[in-house]
């Protein structure tokens, strides 16, 4: 077989083992098809001459290069696998880089007709087979003259013989003079001889079919296992055949049936002789593998599905054996797939190692290894069978085969994961072991896994169990064999692989170059077994029943057939360029190469940055123990630098600081450990490929870093762009982020409830003791106990009263409903009276101005948060709506702040209570949708009251014992003879007792009227509280200096008119804008990178800022009442200073206290700037018209109890429909929180709190019913159909009766409380059942 390179074909990458190639062969209907696409990495090992020039760029994802043979004529199509298939470490001269270089098209053509049917058979088909089965290259017209010279070697098959039987295993006869092969199948055990002179092959004897056909009727004893009705004997479905060594070279062992090993004599070929010598029986399940000992030739080892290794001595008397083995070893693992003795080849020219010392290998006559279904590789010594010498987790899936290195302590394993891994299983006790006898690894995988690999001086590798190299084939490996040849350097060894599947080929790899096989031997059907006859001749059997043989000295290498012309961009962004030199390298390494690598490695290690240097003399694992991280391990000279992570690491989930994101030559994880371009070019002893970095321009790098830093800041921000693109995502985002409730639990009564419960428990214990010891209630001790318990209960009740959230202003004792119910017993009348009294007290508390202000502050905070959420998705209309609501609430807070703290609700309302009850039911747990904490506005108001009031608001006279009013204006409006006033649309009456400065008020009224006549346009400034208060101070100072002051103007009934204070000065920051300067304001929202305080705990991300929001500069703009006038037109009358904060809180005052309003003087009445109730009702109606469900429901839930927006029936129906809508979008936690914290309990009706959960048996699948009378002994955890319980808790070993359960990664289940106790309280990290894998 030969490949014809095309000028458009990619070149094979240089270096020993640098190219990763995954090849596949398929054939159908007897046709050999071939199409190839080779993919190779862009960088190669040190002893290769291929040069690679890389422009600096980011690391590409790992690729898996594949090529296949699928058609007779080559096609131009190809495909690439970008998944990372090589998870193991690289060998020393394998590719230093995991990345694959995508190659171009390779048009290839094969000639000749593949063998078909019975065209070739017997001993006369070898010549014809040779001419037909071999491929003759056809040179295409596009081939260059230089490429035609590579056709010196043609792929030829030397032996090709059809057996006409189903065969599945092959082995050689270990007698060089016989030149024989043994092939076995279900009904065939044949002895074949071949000749290297004429390439002929002949079946000498069939030990199964021949003896069965020639056996006379009276001589059935020759084959005792054959009955008279049997047409032919069968060996086994899992067939394996082996031949003995030396004096037992004539012994053949096969699996006669699934649990027996049959021994045949090769020399007994006549019908009169029984070829079967002995049957070894002892396994309880099928035998998968067996092997002859090369040193102690009388020993046979076998392993099977029962997980036992048995050693047989064929010298033992079979009559005395009685089905017992001479040695039985229980491996305590799963079934054994393959077992092999350590070989002891007697190489005639076996030299010493490179340093003149003999090789240090284990005792071959006592050592064996086994591979198991779990992927575990075990090494044993017969002299100590109770202890495993080595235990290695070789594969992620089942291990299928293994093979020992011919003369060194290495084992190659193949598994279902498609990997062929090389493991060192010897003991490196000598610190001066030469690296030349084995290898010196210098690949990038060694920095990740095993630079402590083969031949590292003084390296304690016995406990690391890291593969020295890994070959990825992409298909499960069923057979592998080392070439029986001595190689001074272990990486120069060849290994033949046979894969499971449709790959009709045998791949021969050099360990020095693991990505591209050295030879590719194609067959007509998938290969089932292979064997090396010597170091050059290899045989295999395929599923078509053919025996094929090749001489690898006459076979071309795959590397010679690869095209060499390719230029590619380094990555998707196009920041690097790759091309190849035409020198492809070789498959071998030399001693000089290792000397160069060792020298360069030491030089690079000593020149690395301090703290990042790894000590080569003690190995990588020792360096890791000394504290070197994965990123700071010094690289080998030809190794690709570890890729620099992005600004936000997906592994650590911690943003990387900008100091580690500087330019490429400054990063500790980039090219700092590589030599510069001049240094590389000066080192002429280094072989290609050379890594030459080209630094990016500083401007580009700076721009790139800026983007990374910006991305780092926004790493926790949700992807708003994806949210905006879908209406469903917008709905889910708003449902999670918006605040639907501001209420929180009254957690302060938990302590009282806990103390009460403890006291009740103690009382129950004492009562039980009294009954148990028959102590009378009249006894002294009993009376003491009862008296003590009563005192304890009273003390608990008093504590609960003090900590109850329901507190009256007069500090009267009101007990909580729970304690009232306990004390009332069966007296329901008394309990109902207590509840009624509690409701009345709640009403009284609701009319407290301080309580109202705190309530409004919570609503302001929720409104501000909702506005910020809408600004995230650039929803400007809804953002403005919530800003409008917030400003309206702030106006209400301003109105209530003018009330005196010692004014009772009766004084404020005239004895009538119309304020609706806010929430009389007991609160539940804290909501996941809102912060529900203390308002920042409230705390800011308490800490900095001067920000909201003038200096004159605080009275300096503390000796009078009267609390100073919050507002000076309120004090001026109070009369001395009146102790009540009514808050309505007009301030109708003033008490003279409350206002000692009546003359000043009269003068103020006169001055105000004069100012109003001169400049009525200044009335627009009356909305700012600070201006009003400062104007009052100026007026007071002016009035104090006026000696002609005579008192205020009054009407005939001595009623003082309201006085709006106006000023001509320029506008100042209003009261509303003052509130907008806190962190919850839109301006503060735009000035912070993300919302830490406004984010919902259940969402997990902070909301990003909106730079395009409408309120970006709103807080910094002076407040003009004209701006507010656009939102709420109004007029201001000369007799109206204030109003009720809302219509729901509007109180009908006493008619006897009303005073007729003054006559209007031409100016229309100016309405107040805000009317919250009307505003909210209009917003709700508009939301219903526009179909804005979230806004409509949000307004109802937040403000219904305060402002009475809609009838209660409509509110409940709206909430129910919204909850069902949340269920449709699987927002169950949001719906549950809304139902939990809304003020109405009966939203879903009587069945709203009920759920039906059907539990089925996990074994039989039947529905488990809990019938009456069976709930105590059985319950929902016992199945009546199969009479078995469900899964038991792995901790307490009791049935899982609750719905709250947990399952571990290993599959064990248990109660959540049990797992909490096991993992959290006790601090365990493993499964309670004893699983070996760590779970935490």
Curated annotation (Swiss-Prot):
SUPFAM superfamilies: WD40 repeat-like. Residues 1024-1044 have a biased composition (Acidic residues). GO terms for molecular function: zinc ion binding. InterPro entries: WD40/YVTN_repeat-like_dom_sf, WD40_repeat_CS, WD40_repeat_dom_sf, WD40_rpt, WDR24, WDR59_RTC1-like_RING_Znf, Znf_RING. Residues 1-35, 107-159, 942-973, 1009-1054, 1096-1115, 1133-1167 are annotated as: Disordered. WD repeats lie at residues 233-274, 282-322, 331-372, 394-433, 472-519, 522-560, 864-905, 1135-1180, 1227-1266. Residues 113-122 have a biased composition (Polar residues). A zinc finger (RING-type) spans 1289-1331. It comes from the Eukaryota. SMART domains: WD40. The keyword Acyltransferase does not apply. GO terms for cellular component: cytosol; GATOR2 complex; vacuolar membrane. GO terms for biological process: positive regulation of macroautophagy; positive regulation of TORC1 signaling. Its main location: other. Keywords: Metal-binding, Repeat, Vacuole, WD repeat, Zinc, Zinc-finger. Residues 942-954, 1010-1019 have a biased composition (Basic and acidic residues). It is found in: Vacuole. Signal peptide: none annotated. Residues 130-147 have a biased composition (Low complexity). May be involved in a process influencing telomere capping. Belongs to the WD repeat RTC1 family. This is Restriction of telomere capping protein 1.
